[in-house]
C-alpha cells in the first residue's frame, strides 16, 4: 500500500484530532515585558539572550553551511528530518555523516517513516556502514492491521527539522533533504525555503527536541558533555526554541502563532505553504487588520498536493474581505514557514499554518526578538513579492466550478491534510 493510502486509511479509521478551543486571547503588545512572559508561559519555552542567528535561504545557502559544520564535527551529530529522499544532496549528506562516523563521531539520525519511508536502502546502508545510528520515527508496519485501535499513533508524525553538531551549532527551518531544495528557489525545479543556523544557549533546546524524539523511538536517553556542553554567549540575539508534541497534549506552536498575531501593532507578514487557519486564527487575523495592522500573507501558487492547495484557497474569502492582502508565489513552490510581526518579532521553522502541524505533528520553530533579523526577513518577504501575484477578492470569487467542487470534497478531511 502506498504511504499516502496508509494515512487515508488511518483518518477513516480513527477520525481526526483538533487543536484546543481558544475562546479569549489576552491583550498583549509585542515588546512589552508582559508579552515575553505570556509567550513563555503558553509555549513552555524560555526566551534566552546571547545567541548568534544566521538566516539561510534555500539550498544554495543552507546545504553548504550544513555540510561544512558536519565535516568539522568532533564529538556528536544529531539529525532529525521529516523528508529524506534519494538524490545528489541525500547522497552527499549520507557520505558526510558516514565519514564523521568512521572518524569516531557519534552520529544519531532520526527519519520520519512517512516522509522518508521511500529512501533507498543504499543511502541508509551508507550511513550505517559508517557507524551512524539510523532510526525511523513511528515505523508503519502490520501492527495496525492486526490491532486497528493502534492506527492512531501512525497519524502523529515528526515533522521537525533538527541538526545539531557537537551540541554547539544548530540548524532548523522548513528544508527537506531532496534535490527539490537545492538551488535558489527562483526556478520551478528548486523550492523556495527559509532556514536558520544557530549558535549560543538556544542550541541546547534544539538538542532537547531531538532527544525527546530519539527517546520515544529508541528508548535511549542521550546526554552528557558531548551532547549537552556548557554553552557560552555567542551573539546578541534573544530568542526561543518552541517545540510542540501534540500527542502529549501540547499545542505550543499554535499558541505562538495566535499570540504573535494578536499582539501586532503595525504589521504581520506570513509566509507558509500549507495555509488552512481555523476560525480562531481567521478571526485574529481579520481583527488585526481591523485595528489598522497591515497583514500580508504569501502562499504558494501551486504545491505538491492539489487537494491541499484547493483546501487552502477555500479560506481566502473572509481574509480578503477583512482587508488582508494575499499573494501567491509563482517562481517555484514556496515552502518557507515564517512570520514577522512589527519588524521586531519573527519565527522560522517547520510548522505549517494548518491543523496537521498544530494538532498532529511534532514541530519545532525558532523565534527571535531582534530588529536586525526581523527586518532582514521583511526584506526577504519584499523580494519574494516580486515573483508573486496578488489575489483580489474578485479573482478568488470567480474561481471555476471545478475548484468549488474540489473544495467540497476537501472540506471533510482538511484538518488531516
Where are these regions (language model features)?
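Hydrophobic helical h-region of N-terminal Sec-dependent signal peptides
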Residues: 8-12
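Charged, low-complexity intrinsically disordered terminal segments
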Residues: 4-5, 15-417
